[in-house]
Curated annotation (Swiss-Prot):
It comes from Xanthomonas oryzae pv. oryzae (strain KACC10331 / KXO85). Residues 1-22 form the signal peptide. PANTHER family: LPS-ASSEMBLY PROTEIN (PTHR30189), LPS-ASSEMBLY PROTEIN LPTD (PTHR30189:SF1). It holds the Pfam family LptD. One of its GO terms (cellular component) is transporter complex. Component of the lipopolysaccharide transport and assembly complex. Interacts with LptE and LptA. It is found in: Cell outer membrane. This is LPS-assembly protein LptD. Keywords: Cell outer membrane, Membrane, Signal. One of its GO terms (biological process) is Gram-negative-bacterium-type cell outer membrane assembly. Together with LptE, is involved in the assembly of lipopolysaccharide (LPS) at the surface of the outer membrane. Belongs to the LptD family. It comes from the Bacteria.
Length: 813
């Protein structure tokens, strides 16, 4: 999503022109007075840029309580109002020379046009030449909160010059910051002001001097320098990024990103954005010639964009590339916005959707970005992939088909030599990651193959006011064409054209009961929703089928009602099982909000499930626990709204076979005044293969408003299993009408080896003028769920519905 544009200021040493820049978050003016410093004047015309351009061709209208003088030198007294186009001039007295066009206005002078609103002691000028001089003024920008005062201002058309003036977005009664300059030129036509020999004051203390400083007076963008970003780290040394914004056209722009790192050298980068009626896109590239630490050239390219072909089809692409496997860790910082990842995904495709169908043709490739891993950790590339999904009702029946054809490729894997510590504890040394060595020893040769997957089905969805009954019969056919290298890779049998076909039968049925009840004086609608799901799939030996993109689903409440345990088409489990589940809800009758919901369910296995993914040579596929005749783990989901501020949720899985819990999750959230929030969560997962603890974590985060101006933020994310913190954040925020200051201290796990790193982030926001320092919003939004209150109401993509971007019939309930 394209961000809004804003202006940033410059450092002491550079005289510059500042354009508007993309902002991650709109300025919060909530602490400002509800009225403008200078409210609009009664009778003044609305702001109209077109009227401003035609101002001199329009007639002048003058009215007042009394009129005296002659026809050539009239004098108006009392509630005088002069109007022409977008101009308004109000005063107690006005003398006019109709032959020359000169005028003098005195007493309670008020002036307004498309850009400015001001009050003054006196105004004089010439209407014919559209020149004016206003003295002893207080002003406000019409389209922004910018305001200030000046000894005088000279106006000519849409250009003006203020003398001995100030500029701020603060309320005049509390000017926390302001720019003071002997001259400020204002160009309403171009949409910016220029201050010469300007001084930025915080309170009454001067803190920065600007020989030449430009700032916006409306929302138009301007070419120039953005405020630099800088930091200090052990990896890069002193790090300085100076963005240069280029406003090339109304629908495209660019930002040059020169960056200096004292330990590495100069990096050159650029960002280009474009927008047109049928689409938009953004490309970013970086190049570091001869990195002094790595002794080689390094770089990256990122692109994302889309084009609407027509109302049914859209082309989309997302391309990512880095020069080496250490690039992400070396250059991960708030300076370029990259995040840590073990791989990067690139996709290019065209996608279509209609009333009864979805389709797509795309290509996908993965790149390794973690130097501690080899290529075996990468998923298969899909080059290309085509899918088509269709479903349509026919009377009481519904028929459909899910189809996919894919060509899979994979780069060969080469052995990565891990560090061999010579002394105890050396493996945990901060710089020991440099000792990982990528060798020329191939440890796995990958072949390629193609797969066709077809799944036609017919169902009969029947329902009434209190029940539903849906039998479904499907047939799944999957065929492969493998090259000889892959076909001969164990445990495959050497068959280059294996296939699998089998029927899938299911019955999904449920009832709905409700009753009206009351509890503690509140009326509720209480529901009881039992549900049954029977699934039968005969066994087919699939050991001769490769595993390309198939993984076991994480067992959850939603998994109780799927017709397969796997995400892809390489495996289709056999099944003779019955799911029994029930949900109960308590809904407040006055507003329909859910007070409490409880769901519980279990699968009864009438026979062993013999199909597994454990014999795969694809390391990414993982492994799974075999399914024996008996019962699955109990799955319980609960959500409870204690009140409008406090909510709790829990997920619990109890395995009757091992008599142990497989999963436990507890989370609670409390909403404070002034958009504050407190989150607390506990997560536990057991490794079902060896019964060890796979994950045991506690997570506490908060945004705590101390008062309307001060707030504290923090996160403590701890691994109980490893007995070490994963991330610690502490910070404070101070906010006012026109100034915000944020400071954070962060300690976090840096890489897969568990090495820790520290960072300090400080950000100053002069609202409506500038923002400098490091972007704290990105860090806090990721770490504290609800840091932006609107994030709490975002609905994540469902894993039980078809997404036109990602065919997978296994995700269809």
């Amino acid at each position: 999503m394209r961000r809004a544009l804003r202006l940033l200021p410059l450092p002491l040493s550079i005289a510059i022109c500042l354009p508007a820049m993309a902002a991650d978050k709109p300025f919060n003016w909530g602490l400002c007075p509800t009225v403008d410093p200078l409210p609009g004047f009664d009778g003044a015309p609305a702001a109209d840029p077109k009227a401003a351009e035609m101002r001199q061709q329009l007639p002048t209208d003058i009215e007042g309580d009394q009129l005296s003088g002659t026809s050539t030198t009239p004098q108006y007294q009392g509630n005088v109002a002069l109007k022409r186009g977008d101009q308004f001039l109000g005063a107690d007295n006005l003398r006019m020379d109709t032959e020359t066009g000169n005028y003098i206005a005195e007493g309670n002078v008020r002036y307004q046009d498309t850009s400015f609103r001001m009050v003054a002691d006196r105004a004089e000028g010439n209407q014919d030449t559209d020149t004016h001089k206003v003295t002893n003024i207080r002003y406000q920008l019409v389209e922004r909160r910018g305001n200030g005062d000046a000894e005088s201002v000279d106006l000519q058309g849409q250009v003006g010059q203020m003398h001995r003036s100030t500029y701020t977005t603060c309320d005049p009664s509390q000017p926390i910051w302001r720019v003071r300059a002997p001259e400020i030129d204002v160009d309403n036509g171009e949409g910016f002001g220029t201050a010469r020999n300007a001084v930025l004051q915080i309170g009454n203390v001067p803190v920065l001097y600007f020989p030449w400083f430009k700032f916006p007076i409306d929302d138009r963008r301007q070419t120039g320098l953005l405020f630099p970003q800088f930091g200090l780290s052990r990896r890069n040394g002193f790090d300085y990024l100076q963005p240069i914004y280029l406003n090339l056209a109304p629908n495209y722009d660019a930002t040059l990103l020169p960056r200096y790192m004292s330990k590495r050298g100069f990096m050159f980068g650029t960002e280009f954005r474009y927008l047109y009626e049928g689409g938009r896109g953004e490309v970013t590239g970086n190049y570091l010639p001869n990195d002094k630490l790595r002794d080689k050239d390094r770089g990256s390219v990122f692109y994302s964009g889309y084009h609407n072909v027509n109302s049914n089809w859209q082309a989309r692409s997302s391309i990512s590339w880095v020069s080496d496997t250490r690039y992400v860790e070396d250059f991960t910082s708030r300076l370029n916005g990259m995040g840590s990842a073990s791989s990067l995904q690139s996709t290019v495709g065209i996608y279509g959707t209609g009333e009864t169908w979805t389709a797509g043709l795309m290509a996908e490739r993965w790149q390794l970005t973690d130097y501690t891993l080899d290529e075996r950790s990468l998923p298969y590339n899909r080059q290309p992939r085509a899918y088509f999904n269709w479903e349509k009702p026919f009377g009481i029946f519904e028929a459909g088909v899910y189809a996919e054809a894919v060509r899979f490729t994979h780069d060969d894997s080469y052995f990565v030599q891990p560090p061999s510590p010579s002394v105890p504890g050396e493996a945990n040394n901060r710089d020991n990651n440099d000792k990982y060595v990528r060798t020329n020893i191939r440890n796995q040769e990958y072949g390629s193959g193609s797969r066709l997957d077809l799944k036609p089905y017919v169902s009969m969805p029947l329902s009434g006011a209190a029940w539903f009954f849906t039998p479904t019969l499907a047939w799944r056919y999957t065929a492969y064409q493998l090259d000889s290298t892959l076909a001969k890779t164990g445990p495959l049998t050497g068959d280059r054209s294996p296939s699998r076909s089998l029927p899938i039968a299911s019955v999904d049925a449920g009832l709905y009961f409700d009753r009206e009840t009351s509890l503690l004086g509140t009326n509720y609608l209480n529901t009881l929703e039992p549900r049954m799901y029977y699934l039968y799939v005969p066994y087919r030996d699939q050991d001769d089928l490769p595993v390309f993109d198939t993984r076991p689903f994480t067992f959850s409440y939603g998994q109780l009602f799927r017709d397969t345990r796997y995400t892809g088409a390489d495996r289709q489990n056999d099944a003779n099982q019955l799911t029994l589940a029930v949900t109960s809800r308590w809904l407040r009758q006055d507003d329909g909000r859910e007070k409490l919901s409880l769901s519980a369910g279990q699968i009864l296995y009438f026979s062993d499930s013999r199909v597994t993914i454990n014999n795969s040579t694809n390391a990414v596929a993982g492994s799974e626990q075999t399914i024996d005749q008996g019962k699955s783990a109990w799955v319980v989901d609960a959500n409870y709204m204690i009140n409008d501020r406090w909510s709790m949720g829990a997920t619990y899985q109890w395995n009757p076979n091992s008599r142990k819990e497989d999963l436990a999750s507890l989370r609670t959230r409390y909403l404070l005044d002034n958009d504050g929030i407190i989150n607390l969560a506990y997560r536990y997962r057991r490794n079902l293969i060896d019964n060890s603890d796979q994950l045991k974590q506690a997570d506490f985060s908060f945004l705590y408003p101390i008062n309307p101006s001060w707030s504290a933020v923090g996160r403590y994310y701890y691994s109980l299993q490893d007995r070490k913190p994963l991330e610690i954040i502490g910070g404070v925020q101070w906010d006012s009408c026109c100034l915000a200051v944020r400071g954070l201290v962060r300690r976090f796990v840096r890489n897969r080896d568990g090495q820790m790193d520290n960072s300090i982030q400080i950000e100053f926001v002069l609202k409506g003028l500038s923002s400098f320092g490091q972007n704290t919003d990105r860090t806090l939004r990721r770490a504290i769920l609800g840091y932006y209150r609107d994030d709490l109401y975002l609905v994540p993509p469902s894993n039980t519905t078809t997404n036109p971007d990602d065919y997978d019939p296994n995700l269809i309930p």
